[in-house]
UniProtKB/Swiss-Prot annotation:
It is found in: Mitochondrion inner membrane. This is Glutamyl-tRNA(Gln) amidotransferase subunit F, mitochondrial. The gene is GTF1. Belongs to the GatF family. The keyword Phosphoprotein does not apply. GO terms for cellular component: glutamyl-tRNA(Gln) amidotransferase complex; mitochondrial inner membrane. It comes from Candida albicans (strain SC5314 / ATCC MYA-2876). Pfam families: GatF. Subunit of the heterotrimeric GatFAB amidotransferase (AdT) complex, composed of A, B and F subunits. One of its GO terms (molecular function) is glutaminyl-tRNA synthase (glutamine-hydrolyzing) activity. Its main location: mitochondrion. InterPro entries: GatF. It comes from the Eukaryota. It catalyses: L-glutamyl-tRNA(Gln) + L-glutamine + ATP + H2O = L-glutaminyl-tRNA(Gln) + L-glutamate + ADP + phosphate + H(+).
Length: 165
């Protein structure tokens, strides 16, 4: 467990700066007020990256799907999305089991992971299919479902006597 924690801690260190000992409250306050790192330190350059870039077409498609109008400043949105994708890829760099999309798949699938239920219409529910599923049901003893018929219930007779009071 310690080795996992140690390796995780090593991955979180972004620079090898040494800081002087902070002794007073004012020194600590001043130190915390200054930004000592930038998210840009963690981002790889988009030119050396093998990831697909977010194209203006994808931005327009996302805006259309979200119900927003086309923006006049598509460039800034595209740049922001590219930076976010680079940062997310940085977070998952240590995960060697990530699946890379095959070239035959849609370009958007490599960028946005959609659940099948989000974009594929389901078959409509029909009465015939429901009746077929009901007929195919079998009782499962592991769930406490016991197989019995109506004749099993009718075998035991119950008599209720009403008393007149």
């Amino acid at each position: 467990m310690k080795s996992i924690l140690r390796s995780t801690t090593r991955n979180l260190i972004t620079s090898s700066r040494r800081f002087e000992n902070l002794k007073t409250t004012e020194e600590i306050r001043n130190f915390l007020a200054e930004s000592t790192w930038s998210i840009n330190e963690l981002l790889k350059s988009p030119t050396g990256s093998s990831q697909p870039e977010v194209s203006p077409e994808i931005v327009k498609k996302m805006l259309k799907l979200s119900g927003l109008n086309d923006l006049k400043d598509d460039q800034s949105v595209t740049k922001a999305l590219n930076l976010q994708m680079m940062f997310i890829n940085h977070l998952y760099d240590n995960d060697h089991e990530t699946v890379t999309p095959s070239p035959k798949r849609n370009e958007n699938n490599g960028i946005f992971r959609l659940l099948a239920s989000d974009h594929l219409p389901q078959r409509p529910l029909e009465l015939n299919n429901l009746l077929k599923q009901i007929n195919e049901l079998k009782p499962d003893p592991s769930k406490g479902e016991v197989d019995f018929t109506i004749s099993d219930l009718q075998r035991d007779s119950f008599v209720i006597n009403k008393r007149k009071e």
